[in-house]
Structure formats: C-alpha cells, structure tokens
Regions:
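Catalytic cores of the polymerase beta-like nucleotidyltransferase superfamily
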Residues: 1-420
Length: 420
C-alpha cells in the first residue's frame, strides 16, 4: 500500500458537507467534549460521518482520539469498558447510549524480510496520528473525520468526493486490504447495495479471487455482520448480490450452488427471497425484524432433508426432529456463531410447523398459548408460496383465527399475520 508520508487533508466546511449537527447523539457529544476538556483531540469518524453527509440518521457513533485506551478508561472510569481482541477499543456508556472510542493507529513498521507482515497487521496495537490512522481504514467513504467544534469534515483520501460521486473505493490495493481483513469483502457489498454506490477500484474479479478468504473469518464476527446485512432494510438486495457473486455459501454452506440442483433447495431460495423482502418492508416501516425468523427460513430446506435422512436410520419418530434440528444448527454455527437465544427461537418455529401442517381444533387451541404462534404461522404462510399443498391448510388457519378473534383468544392483531 502506498502511504503518503505527509498527507495534506481537505478541510470541508458546512457549505460543502451540509451536516445537520443536531443529528449527532448526546452520547457522542459527551465523549468528544470530555476528551477535549482533558487535553486530547477527538473526532467523529467512519460510518456516522458518512451517513451524516448523506443526510441519513446514523445507527451508531464512533469516536477516535489520540488518547490511549488506558487513558480513556482513566477519564471515564466506571462509564467505560475495554473491548476488542484484534485492536483495543473502549466502550463509553452515557445514559442509555454506548459510544465506541478508538485510538489513532498507524501501519506497523514493515521489515522487508517479514513474511508474516499481513498476519501481524491483523492484531497490532501500534498507535499513531490522525494522518496515519486514515490509511488503516478500509474504504475512502469510511475514512472521514468530523470536528464538532469547527464543524469541518477532514478528508485525506477523497472520500467526500467519492460519496458525492456515489462511488465506493478501497484505500490502497483491494486484494491486500481484503487479505488483511476478509470482512471488508462483505462490507464492500453491503455498502454498495444499501447506499446504492458503484464500485470504483474493486472489480468482480477481486471478489472471486478473494472469496475463499471469508472462510478465515471468526464465526462471531460473521454473526455480527449478518445482523447488519439483514436487519437494516436492504437484506434482499444484499442476499441477491451474495448469490450472484457465488459468495453466499461462505455464510450458509447449505446454499452451495451444487445443492441448488435439488428441487427442495430451489424452492427454498424463492422462500428466502420473499422473507427478506418482507423483512425490508418491516424495517422501513419502523417495525421489528427478527434474525431468528430469517435463519429459520434459510435453514428450513436443510432441516427437511436431514429429517428425511434420519427416518432411514431412526425408528423412533419422536426423536427425529430434535436430532435433525441439533445437527443443522451445530453445522451452521461452525460458520456463523448463531447464539443460543436465536437458535432456540428457530427450533420453536420449526417444531410447531407439524401442528400447522396437520391441524386439529384441539391442537390449534393449544397453540394459541404458544409464544411463537405468530412467527410460526407467518413462517407457515411463507412456505405455502412455494409448497402448494399447504394452501388449503393456510385457509383453514385463517378461518380459525377469525373465530379465535371473535372469542378474544387471538393473542396478536390479525394485521400482524402475513397475507401473501
């Protein structure tokens, strides 16, 4: 990577950026002003600056400073908590808000004979200045700093103009940046699709060349990224891009292209896309979205096939579902660390599908007390779009819910059920 020795930033005032400072959270303001009053520099950085320039409401605010982690903790005391294995960060709590604070970093001193430079780069804690820190960041649009007192955007790498041109560009050589941290592959796709940006110096060939690196990512980091990809209103377009680039199987191995020849998986792909579209609509309307529901949809076809396979090996039908669900979830968490709070909901949604498929009035009345009734029913309605034999049964349940509503037994508004 070519790093300028003495980079000169562009200082862009409000006439250029038009940032609405009232959108900056109280917590971020508190952290920055406290650091400055203690004699340190502090700026907003990264995605929050990008979103403010685009006139979007940031999901969270990150602060960067020349104070080292131990100094940050000393300043904020019990309000702070150190985090991070790859690089030491500090979370500062102010009321109900948590602000992530990092220290300026620099590139490690590279020795020509150091063959493990890239590996060292992933875990270093070498502190630096703002002009060095900028070259540790992934994309130009995420390498913008904002001074809340001067109200200026500090731009070392042309990120502001990439934003105005609707471009996403790696800082330095894309392959090297992806090799340093393969998560940047997924982030590039997420930013390009959600912000409607075109790739500037990143080609489809780079994704194909680097896709295998995704296997090196920790399962915990992948779950965190999955939440961002699927719960922020652009899940369908992100998913379609991952499928088109043949990268989706690095997240969900069951969606490997070889499996797509199986009719069960083909139907499943259509169901997944419908579920993601509905999730996006809910997010845009300010309604809740459930990652457990989406994971249950994505892994459903694998569960059905696993159940079929186990029936050839196990005679006790009562054991088959639990074993199959455990096998599918255990295999998936090797790639994405789905936490138990999520996987338990998935199991519950799956388990009541048998009641929806073969309802009796007695079982249906019992199901009215089940906390996963609405999620399970919506899942069942989704399935009916690609599993035609379920259509009549969906009608049965709709009539049942009408009666339950009249008797004040329906535990949720009928408007919260899917009508596809």
């Amino acid at each position: 990577m070519d790093v300028l020795k003495n980079p000169v930033p562009r200082l862009l005032n409000k006439a250029h950026h038009n940032i609405d400072v009232s959108k900056i959270s109280d917590g971020a303001n508190f952290v920055i002003r406290t650091l400055k009053s203690s004699g340190y520099d502090a700026f907003l950085v990264g995605g929050c600056v990008r979103d403010l320039i685009l006139q979007n409401d940031p999901n969270d605010f990150d602060v960067v400073t020349n104070a080292k982690p131990n100094e940050i903790i000393k300043i904020f005391g019990r309000q702070s908590r150190p985090i991070g294995k790859r690089f030491k960060l500090v979370h500062v709590r102010s009321k109900d808000e948590v602000t992530e604070v990092s220290t300026f970093r620099r590139m490690p001193r590279r020795i020509k004979s150091d063959k493990n430079f890239r590996k060292r780069l992933k875990g270093d804690n070498e502190f630096g200045s703002i002009s060095e820190d900028v070259f540790r960041r992934d994309f130009t649009i995420n390498a913008l700093y904002f001074d809340i007192d001067q109200k200026v955007v500090i731009d070392y790498v042309g990120g502001f103009y990439d934003l105005t041109d609707r471009k996403i560009s790696c800082i330095g050589n894309p392959f090297e940046r992806f090799e340093e941290d393969p998560m940047r592959i997924l982030r590039a796709i997420r930013f390009a699709t959600t912000l409607k940006l075109s790739m500037k110096n990143i080609s489809l060939a780079e994704f194909s060349r680097c896709g295998g690196l995704l296997s090196n990512l920790s399962a915990a980091r992948l779950f965190y990224e999955l939440e961002k990809m699927f719960l922020r209103g652009s899940a369908a377009v992100v998913f379609n891009e991952l499928v088109g680039l043949n990268l989706i199987h690095f997240l969900f191995p069951i969606l490997d292209r070889n499996n797509m020849e199986d009719p069960v998986y083909k139907r499943s792909l259509d169901t997944i896309k419908i579920a993601l579209q509905i999730t996006d609509e809910r997010v845009k309307m300010g309604q809740s979205a459930n990652l457990a529901f989406l994971c249950a949809v994505i892994l459903w076809s694998a569960l059905k096939i696993e159940i079929q396979n186990l029936r050839c090996q196990i005679t006790d039908e009562s054991l088959i579902f639990d074993i199959a669900a455990e096998n599918i979830i255990s295999n998936q968490i090797k790639t994405i660390a789905i936490p138990r709070r999520v996987s338990n909901i998935m199991r519950e949604i799956w388990k009541i599908q048998s009641v929806f498929e073969n309802p009796t009035r007695r079982d249906a009345n019992r199901l009215l007390q089940n906390r996963r009734l609405r999620a399970g029913y919506n899942f069942f309605v989704l399935r009916s779009k690609t599993e035609d034999y379920l259509t009549d049964t969906v009608d049965w349940w709709r009539k049942f819910f009408v009666v339950a509503k009249k008797m004040n037994k329906l535990p949720f508004p009928e408007s919260q059920t899917y009508r596809l």
